[in-house]
């Protein structure tokens, strides 16, 4: 499982022109782009959620937990693109939707159980994601 994290001052995700998730924190929040690969499981999703919740990437070396910062979760299978051969990426390392969808939902649920305010995109949908990266700060978590 890979989670590409961006510290933001605001973010929104639209599907078919309609906002389906948005965060507008008083200070900073996080956008988590989540990719799932073969062999990922619920334990991995929970561990990465806890790592994200406690990751000290907000102002003053604070975590989302410290600041009660909101998190926008977006599924993104392209985090497992393989560009080693040719000019067209392979997606073979990305788990199929039937595996990935429940694990991304479990990741978001684990964040909520930890106390996070979580917004989310729509799994499998074509989404337009708008965000204002603050810093910029972008970190890759892998588990």
Swiss-Prot record:
Chain ranges for the short sequence motif Gly-cisPro motif, important for rejection of L-amino acids as given in the UniProt record: 135-136
Subcellular location: Cytoplasm
GO biological process: D-amino acid catabolic process
Pfam family, one: Tyr_Deacylase
Catalytically driven reaction(s): glycyl-tRNA(Ala) + H2O = tRNA(Ala) + glycine + H(+); a D-aminoacyl-tRNA + H2O = a tRNA + a D-alpha-amino acid + H(+)
Domain of life: Bacteria
GO CC list: cytoplasm
Entries under PANTHER family matching the protein: D-AMINOACYL-TRNA DEACYLASE 1 (PTHR10472:SF5), D-TYROSYL-TRNA TYR DEACYLASE (PTHR10472)
NCBIfam families according to UniProt: D-aminoacyl-tRNA deacylase (TIGR00256)
Family the UniProt entry places it in: Belongs to the DTD family.
Subunit and partners: Homodimer.
Role played: An aminoacyl-tRNA editing enzyme that deacylates mischarged D-aminoacyl-tRNAs. Also deacylates mischarged glycyl-tRNA(Ala), protecting cells against glycine mischarging by AlaRS. Acts via tRNA-based rather than protein-based catalysis; rejects L-amino acids rather than detecting D-amino acids in the active site. By recycling D-aminoacyl-tRNA to D-amino acids and free tRNA molecules, this enzyme counteracts the toxicity associated with the formation of D-aminoacyl-tRNA entities in vivo and helps enforce protein L-homochirality.
Protein name: D-aminoacyl-tRNA deacylase
């Amino acid at each position: 499982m890979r989670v590409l994290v961006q510290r933001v001052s605001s973010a929104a995700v639209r599907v078919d022109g309609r906002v389906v998730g948005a965060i507008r924190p008083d200070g900073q929040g996080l956008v988590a782009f989540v990719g799932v690969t073969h062999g990922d499981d619920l334990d991995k999703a929970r561990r990465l959620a806890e790592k994200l919740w406690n990751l000290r990437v907000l102002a003053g070396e604070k975590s989302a937990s410290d600041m009660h910062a909101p998190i926008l979760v977006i599924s993104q299978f392209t985090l497992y693109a393989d560009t080693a051969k040719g000019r067209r990426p392979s997606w073979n390392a990305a788990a199929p939707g039937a595996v990935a969808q429940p694990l991304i939902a479990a990741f978001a649920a684990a964040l909520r159980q930890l106390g996070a305010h979580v917004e989310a995109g729509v799994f499998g949908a074509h989404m337009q994601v708008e965000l204002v990266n603050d810093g910029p700060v972008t970190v890759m978590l892998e588990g």
